[in-house]
Amino acid sequence: MQPFTTHTGLAVMIDSTNIDTDQIIPKQFLSKVTRDGFGVHLFHDWRYLDDAGDVPNPEFSLNQPRYKGASILVSQENFGCGSSREHAPWALADFGLRAIIAPSFADIFYGNSINNGLLPVALTHAQVRQLMDEVAAEEGAQITVDLTSCKVISPSGAEFSFTLAESARHKLLNGLDAIGLTLSHAAQISQYETQIQGWRS
């Protein structure tokens, strides 16, 4: 998993509340079990005017030329609600997004994002609105997300602090998923297993 320390990237916004996981990645695209290849289906029903995904919707923000290559998504409250599917953060990450900024997130989506290297940043409604206004006002507007200091820097230079559980912050800073976190304690695990063998003999 790629470590997340500080990232500056082009920002895109979807000014909608209660974006659920079926909107993020519709159920008909969930047959794959590997993490790659989901980005093309991200927000399928909004990005495309046809079921096959051949006709892009020019009104949808992710299809607009000014947002091409965006790596930070700004959205509204309760992002990632709905059914639990790890495919949702997979699709967002595969599309090229590194961080999602919103006033609140669904709990399961929040945890799945952290476990897959996607940083969910919760800011106040007013701060999110300011970010959206600045992104809309300036083509090419970039946002910086600094996980080392837990700050978001807006295109105009305004700084907003956010919080993240230290365990989640540690995993993201070091690029550790659940397996990687376990392997980081390999020496202690080996020592414990040796002790267990001694007790059993």
Swiss-Prot record:
Q: What class does this enzyme belong to in the EC scheme?
A: lyase
Name of the featured protein: 3-isopropylmalate dehydratase small subunit
Which transformation does this protein catalyse, written as a reaction? (2R,3S)-3-isopropylmalate = (2S)-2-isopropylmalate
EC numbers on record: 4.2.1.33
A Pfam family the protein falls into: Aconitase_C
Functional pathway: Amino-acid biosynthesis; L-leucine biosynthesis; L-leucine from 3-methyl-2-oxobutanoate: step 2/4
| Alphabetical list of InterPro entries matching this protein | 3-IsopropMal_deHydase_ssu, Aconitase/3IPM_dehydase_swvl, AconitaseA/IPMdHydase_ssu_swvl, IPMI_Swivel, LeuD
